[in-house]
Structures are given as structure tokens and as C-alpha cells.
Amino acid sequence: MKVERFDPETDGTSVRACHEIYLSGLPDDDPLGPPMSPRVFAGWLALGWTEDPLETWLARDDSGEPCGWYLLNLPQRENRHRASLELTVHAARRRAGRGTTLLRHAAGRAAQAGRTVLEGQAGEGSPGAAFASTLKARSPGTGVRRVLPLDRPPAGRQAAARAEAESAARAYTLRTWVGPAPEDAVAGVAAVNGALADAPRAPGEEEQVWDVARVRGDERRVAAMGLRAHVIVAQAATTGDLAALTQVCVDPAMPEWGFQELTAVARPHRGHRLGLLLKLAMLDLLAAKEPQLTRIITGNDVGNDHMIAINDQLGFDVLDRWPWWELDVADVPADLAARA
């Protein structure tokens, strides 16, 4: 098997091969969730979910056929001791040592970059989770995905939640936009995003520090993937300060799905049910602007009790569980070719 690095921004053939391999594994790896469309997948390989440098490697078997790939994310601002790994082998070519070879190759690259921990996620009960267990990887936490079916909202539940939220948040006004934040709001968005530091995270994982440049970079990645990003913020009526925000993205290639991204409330403004208010307002906005939506998917750490309670109040149903896995790079025998 030969493993070669490629540039997803210029090598569309390799990107398509990786997407086909990804799709082949979905019945086992992620049977319940929405697949990434070709444009979103290509944008992810090229740009990632964050601004950090990426390495994308494609494996070919002895006949030259693509059989697996991995994406290595190397954080540069925080968590410089860690590397995030996404690794997939074609469903028809599994259980033949290819995944182990790719893991060793990735570990070698991570070590060369000075990283000591590899991290990744695999659905509960999936081949990836079994592989991680075989490697004796640690599981420091678990994400839980939930789905809100928009065609059958829980009777009376959202109306009661709306009355509660509106009563508690009378000192705030709402503002909406699609796409990048207006110039007069982007600094406030960065400040509110900083509240994510309070969300549960793995031991030893450093919190992200948000600034305007990081917000703008995130917006550029969303635009490059062709996603429509609907944003609602709450502002303090007396000062105009941004107090909370929520964002839902829609992929035109999969118009029935809404992807709930971050929801955050700045510390000084907590206790006014702003998270609940914004999510209810977003449902109203999507009903008007994206009437084709049939469901919204979201994910939370299993320990994020507050946001889970809000999602339960709105009628989200548990879809599946995705443990995080960590492995010390030193525990993976590195592929010498990865150091070349």
C-alpha cells in the first residue's frame, strides 16, 4: 500500500476518491446522520472546521486503487500538543491491516510536528470505536447527537417554553443576519463565542480564544463550503451589547437538514433564558426562510446539562452517541515512511 499526500484545493480527483471511500463506510460508520455533500466534504478536506493547518493523505493498494485516507489537523494557537485525526478505509477493504498502517503513518506525522496526543471521534458501536478499543485508546468524553423533527413539534411544549423565555428576556432585543457578521457586530460575536470556554472539554484540552480574525476565518470556511448560515443574536436593550447568539447552517445540496452550530450566552447575561429564546426564534426564522427543512441536527457533550435541557424542552430526540478517543503518539509504532 502506498500513502501519498495531496492538496485538496488543486487535486479534485483525489478529493472525489476520498469522498467515495467516505460514502462507502457510512452504513457502518454513521448510519443515522446526514452525509456530507461533495462540496462540503471538499471544503472540509481543504480548510477543516478550524483555521489550523491540515495534512490530507490518500492510500492506494498495490493495483493503484484508492483504498483509504486520513486527515490530520494540527492546532497552532491552543492545544499544540494534540493532533486531531479523521481516518477512513473503504468498506470493501477493511480488516486487512490498512487502517493500522494509516494510523501508524499519521502517528509519525504527528510526532514530526511535535504532537504527543492523537484524538478523534467514532460513533458508539461502529468499527472505528472497536478499532479504538483494540488500541486501548482512552475515552475522555462523549458527544450526543439529537434531532428535532420539524413536522411534529411536541404539542404545547414549545408554546410553554416561548412564554417562559420571553418573560425572562424582556431586557433584550433580537437581530438576525445571513452569512458574515456585520462590521459593527463581529467583535461582539467574538466576545460571545468566548463563552464556549465554559463548555465541557477533555482533561488537558485548552479552551479556544476567540477574536475577530478567528470569527472571520470561520465565516470564510462556511462560505467556501456553500452553506447558508442563519444567525440570531440577542442584544442588551440598554447598551446594545451582544449577549448571546445561535447559528444554523443549511447545505443547498441537502436542503431538508438544518445543522445547528454553536449557541452561546456571555457570562454576564446568563439566567435570562437567552439560549432558549434564540433557539425558538431560530425555529420561527427557519420556518419562514427555509420552509423545506424537515429536521435539525445538533450535538452536545454528554456533560453539557444546560444545553441538553434546552434541547429536550424544544423536543429534540436522541439520535446516537459519539465517544471521543485519545491515544498517546508514543504508543503507536510510527511508520518510518511518514518521517521521510
Each model region followed by its residue ranges:
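Conserved beta-strand-loop-alpha-helix junction that forms the acyl-donor binding cleft
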Residues: A91-R94, E119-A129, A266-R270, R295-I308, ...
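Conserved GNAT acetyl-CoA-binding A-motif
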Residues: R82, A110-G123, L286-G299
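Conserved beta-strand in the GNAT
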Residues: T56-L58, E65-L74, S84-E86, V231-V233, ...
